[in-house]
Amino acid sequence: MRRWLLPLVLLAEIALFTNLSGQSFASASDSGSYFKSYFADLICQSAPVLLLAFGMTIVLMTAGIDLSVGSLVALVACVMSSFPAGTEFWWTAVPLGLALALLLGATNGALIAWLDVPPIIATLGTMILYRGLCFVVMGDLEKSPFLSVPAYERLGQISGASLLVLLTFIILGFWLNCSRWLHEILMLGGNPIAARYAGIPVTRRIMQVYSLVGLLGFLAALTFTARNSSVSASSLTDRKSVV
């Protein structure tokens, strides 16, 4: 019974605020359409946060944190928006965005793993750096080439966003459950010195964790730009961290 408590509380909260908003329904079909639209919009808006939260969960397992995720996603989106729209966007901007996201994530990992910079200091610095690069790329402009890219808007719709999030969770969840990687990450987070003595490649694992955050940041950039159709240098300034 306790596992149903939170969903029931959330459902009651939605019903309460729907009533307070003055929304009225003439029939049950009207209410069904309203809630279908409400949850579809909720999932689409939450897709970037869900993807980033998965990566942040892994980071927290290493006893680290990543404050740069919002700036990382914004920089990837800004660079992608600089490419001309059209079919070629899929094999120019998208692969470059993926490579950039992995590079930015690996940069965080290198600062932490190789230079022994504390995660909160390292990612605070890269948060400022990546945000500054957003302004270098964009200036004061707001670009919106994404609507002209064939099929790109589907990533911001309920079918595309939910499918992308679901596939990502299934693939990564299966990999984590079927490999030693997750156990090594947990041991690393508990005691990195003991993890080294146990033969765990601590430096490599930290690099992999922050590169994974970069990969998920790239997917978040896809869903964010597909949903909002435009990006500016100040996008996602409220996403300093996702916990």
Language-model-detected regions and their locations in the chain:
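Membrane-interfacial amphipathic/re-entrant helices at transmembrane-helix boundaries
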Residues: M1-L51, T87-T92, I200, Q208
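Hydrophobic alpha-helical transmembrane segments
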Residues: R3-L8, L42, L50, S71-L72, ...
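Hydrophobic core segments of alpha-helical transmembrane domains in multi-pass membrane transport
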Residues: L6-T18, M56, M127, R131-G132, ...
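Single transmembrane alpha-helix segments in multi-pass membrane proteins
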Residues: E13-T18, Y34-G86, A110-D116, V243
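Helix-loop junctions at the membrane-solvent interface of multi-pass transporters
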Residues: N19-L20, T62, F83-T87, L103, ...
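Hydrophobic alpha-helical segments embedded in the membrane of multi-pass proteins
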Residues: Q45-M56, S71-L75, L103-A106, L166-L167, ...
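Helix-loop-helix "hairpin" substructures at the membrane interface of multi-pass membrane proteins
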Residues: F89, A93-P95, L103-N108, I158-V231
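Transmembrane helix-bundle core of multi-pass membrane transporters
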Residues: L115, P119-S179, R205-Q208, F224-L236
